[in-house]
Amino acid sequence: MRHRVGGWKLGRNTEHRRALLRNLVTSLIVEERIETTVPKAKAMRPHVEKMITLGKQGNVAARRQAAAYLMTSEAVDKLFNTISPRFGDREGGYLRIVRTGFRPGDGGEKAFIELLGSEKIIDEKREKRAAARAKRAEDNRKALEAQQAQAEAETTGETKA
């Protein structure tokens, strides 16, 4: 009997589950917000908490432990330089899981998992993208007007000749 045996199996063998969780943790640290299923979000929560706690220690040994778990050096740098200082005075509870509904294909429950305090950063990224998109649309509109003016000038020039 497996009474009170903890952990999430997620329908995978040990190596696959470990790789999945490492990838999810790395993605969350880099992106600060990801969408996944609720069981995966719940399974990765303790791993992210441990990584942030390592980041708060800030010594070489902690950096090496984090580098051994995380998939990219970019994630390690962001963990130690950006994320951990944000939670300097907080003892745990660094994440928020927000349920977003069910997946149409198989009915799996989806959720966003995000670092607390990342709302401002995500909003800044969204505003920056919107500004870039608006600038690109304006440039395209000006280029189209210039093309239309040039085509109109060519057609009026042909009728005079």
Curated annotation (Swiss-Prot):
**Looking at the keywords, is Ribosomal protein present?**
yes
Q: Which InterPro entries match?
A: Ribosomal_bL17 (IPR000456), Ribosomal_bL17_CS (IPR047859), Ribosomal_bL17_sf (IPR036373)
Respond yes or no to whether keyword Ribosomal protein is given for this record: yes
Which keywords does UniProt give here? Ribonucleoprotein, Ribosomal protein
Q: Where is this region: Disordered?
A: 132-161
Q: Which biological processes are named by the entry's GO terms?
A: translation
PANTHER family from the xrefs? LARGE RIBOSOMAL SUBUNIT PROTEIN BL17M, RIBOSOMAL PROTEIN L17
**What is stated as this protein's family in its record?**
Belongs to the bacterial ribosomal protein bL17 family.
- Subunit relationships: Part of the 50S ribosomal subunit. Contacts protein L32.
Q: What is the name of this protein?
A: Large ribosomal subunit protein bL17
Q: Which organism is it from?
A: Koribacter versatilis (strain Ellin345)
The primary gene name is rplQ
